[in-house]
Amino acid sequence: MKEAGQMQNLESAGAGRSVSTQTGSMTGQIPRLSKVNLFTLLSLWMELFPAVKAQRQKSQEKEEGKHGPLGDNEEMARTSTDKKQVKRTGLVVVKNTKIVGLHCSSEDLHAGKIALIKHGSRLKNCDLYFSRKPCSACLKMIVNAGVNRISYWPADPEISLLAEASSSEDAKLDAKAVERLKSNSRAHVCVLLQPLVCYMVQFVEETSYKCDFIQKIAKTLPDANVDFYSECKQERIKEYEMLFLVSNEEMHKQILMTIGLENLCENPYFSNLRQNMKDLILLLATVASSVPNFKHYGFYCGNTEQINEIHNQSLPQEIARHCMVQARLLAYRTEDHKIGVGAVIWAEGKSRSCDGTGAMYFIGCGYNAFPVGSEYADFPHMDDKQKDREIRKFRYIVHAEQNALTFRCQEIKPEERTMIFVTKCPCDECVPLIKGAGIKQIYAGDVDVGKKKADISYMRFGELEGVSKFTWQLNPSGTCVHEHNEPESKENGVLRPLPSGEEQHQNKKLCLGNH
């Protein structure tokens, strides 16, 4: 009962405490996402990375005459019809508990092969988190590279076992080859899922609804449906459950037995596994809904004089939203009892790479926390409600942007476009660091811009020059950009308005049914 025992150990570990990246013994007043669950959620989310232009064009050509969207991010991530058996897969590469790579399958390469190309021998002793169990072709190469551990989501594998009967035999043979590679390799190939700590889902729901992006919509569109967030979340839940879960229990058991997890097919292990998976999907859908594809909202430059120039350099909105959700997930590892902040840095190379992320590649990420190696009682945890400024936390917390820069896995190249996504407006302490590091663009909320609070101020962000700032707001040009129209409508990141005579949002599938 090796796998079942492993699940028991993980459950007891998850129920006890969450091991922190920064301070290993931190047990705060708020529920906290474990590292294992964070990496797992990020791998699932990377599977949904918006498809690059070539994939978008092909899928649109197959639609022949159907204008408008193929759906939200998750719809764009579906594999082409001639490759249904090979599922798109997300991958998180972790070294010494730090994320050093975020990848997803491309049209030509699986996620494991992309990791090998990108990291090479540096994969030695790394932990890899896949959104699906990798195929034998990928596994033999990453095992050969000397990885430490390979974790995967225990549902339909990369070579789908849910495909047509004509191809199921090949899928079963591949699954057997994977098991032989697993049993004869030094790498630990396993399922790492921890139950969420008590009240975690409730906490994520409350904080997602109260986050800057949702509240900005609620304040600027008072006539909007007050329940738009709940409707958006319910749609996401349905879509993600279809993509990442196996609804039929017997079919799920068949898959588990085929991929070597027969010990998890007995209760209570099977029911616990399915519940843990469902809880994580609910959490992912909740966080993803906090940066919604809603009406004309997105990340735009507020300066109307620079709009045309800035748009020529901006990311497509679907990619900007995806990266911001990455940062939102990171924020749930915070060590700040009052507010969690997450930050992620990406860069865009001169040409498209083999990765499913296109020309974009991961630089680093972080969240606000106390210095590495410190214990829970080493520093004050009081906020500005404490009158004695000496025992407040603000002098000791390392900000999310600072951690992302400190623990970056690649250098920032001045000739490339590097961008940082932050869940809150960067403060006066971080703004000069971001500019000094050579980051070209900032994507953030602007709720706190120009404010000066008791221990922290946000005055410099509005005055910042030389760095493009894209904040969450209504499209200031007054034109709704049709994100899923013909491929020419978004070329090299250029957002172009539709012809005036064309119906805005034609066949548009929003997160909301009505708006």
Give each language-model segment a name.
Residues 1-515:
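Zinc-dependent deaminase catalytic domain
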